[in-house]
Amino acid sequence: MGKTLVYNTGNAKPPTDEIHLEIGVFFDGTLNNLKNSELRMKYRDGKNKIESTDSRDDILKKEKAIEKTREQQEKEYKKLDNKDITDNDSEYDRYLKSSHRGWLDKQGVDNSFSNDYTNVARMYKCCEQYNYGVYVEGIGTLNNSRDVDDGFQYGSGITGVRGKVRKGCEMTADRIGALKKQQRGKKVLTRITIDTFGFSRGAAAARNFAYEINGIKRNQDVEIKKSRKIVGYTQFNSPEGPVMVPEYGDIWIDKDDTEVDPKYIKNGKLPKFGFLGYYLLSKKIVSEQELENIELDVRFIGVYDTVSSYEEFGDMGALRRVGWEGMKHSVLGPKHNFGDDVEQLQLKNPGSYFRAVHFTAANEHRENFSLTRFPGSIEKEFPGVHCDIGGAYENGMETVDEIETSNHKPLWFLNKRRQQLIDEHWYYKEQIEINNKFLNAISFGNVYRKITGIRFLRKEYSYIPLHFMEELGVNLYDHQIITKTEATYSIDHDQYLPHTKDLLHNYVFTGGEKWNFQSDEEFEKEKKERARERAENPEPIWEKPSDETVDKDGNIIKTQTLQEVVVTAYHPQKLLRIMRHEYLHWSANRDWMGMDPNNDYQRRIYGE
């Protein structure tokens, strides 16, 4: 039977001879990295950094200036004698090398330096960081280094999902060690309370982290097996000349082929709390007996749009990644590698927790972005795509070069698809076009055609899920928030977003209906039905009250006319159309590897 966690509204102090710690572990998303975003803002954006309060005209001017800076930095990169990253590089030279995009990079998504903060990074920036917050950079990224394709494409290797979970365990152990040293006297560490947050693959990492330190383990996830590796070389002389012969030594590895020190393994298995326990022991932070006496509670799990897309290949390198494994993935489809993630990562087995929250994207439908549901959590679906919910977009022009192409669909379908996106209020007709239409027709479909959409969008809609995540942590972790997210990432200046937030707040907190899109035909039909009901049931005619009235005791009371208050409200369907036109992005794109839509434009969902 699982343990029951009970929290009150106060922050109870531990006994004087005990240490109780609270730590929040933040796992950022794929190609999301707080440090790399800061470096781009420092070196590329500079005085042209785009602010949430900037007007459209201001943003467009800044975009042009930023692009000029980017072009200048490309010239500076080309002048560097050594393009490889070294320990002797200045921060700026390392930034130039790390943020540079080669030809192959440009066939995929932009890199982690070009993304804005996610909601994971935003909340981390708002929380107490010295004692509480532990930030783990996103899957496929390293601080001020080039992004790693093994992590980005497969969630694999040192920057993959499990690699980041192990890093989260090590960083948490380091934080525990630092806090433990601060305590004077003979105090004993007896309790650790963990909150964990994540977005995208970082959400999968946060859920797997909870399993790692708190879940009911499968044997295969804790068993350590013996293996061998090359530990050196011996030279032998042969008739053909000297020959280097490898020498092998015994090592111990976990299921991901991560080498561990057998001194801290118990009965052939990882210790209590998995890799967190292993690092606490191997770093001499606690003794075996102390570890056994520690209680660990997972208090809050807050995740945005869990996308695992995981297969552990280790650190493959380019040849294997684009070779056999890449061909298999391309031919067999994402389900071949990613269809078993729920079981592999034990995403439905985080162990006991007090509260879990999962915010998901209603309009995401890329083939590599299948959703993994979170049974037992407060799970709410919001309009928008992946990063509309978790963050990472910047304000500015969005160009989707290949929404759909004639390589995948016939011309008649492209026309139909374009009109569908107009009818569903993603684009105005002047924002979306089909290129090479005439040449395609006279060449009997042989000339390549594509649907391209270009529009200006704002990012601040993504602040709303962030605000809700903090609100759902009230009386749990909110005392660790130093600057409120509502203030730091405000939407008060916006004309529409406060109304949007009110509508979604009703859905999240008071059981209101999910905000679904209605077609224009459905909307007009509903309006006519409401008009008919009003005609059949007219409201009573308002009569101005007299200047005075009499109470029950016969006393005359003068009436006072109050100042009229005008409340501006938007019909939910009109507001949703504004959101789609001005705030919600379009993520699927056949122009970039790994960003293709599912053929039916519907999202695949696991873990239901």
Residue ranges and their predicted role:
Residues 1-608:
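Active-site- or binding-pocket-proximal scaffold segments within functional domains
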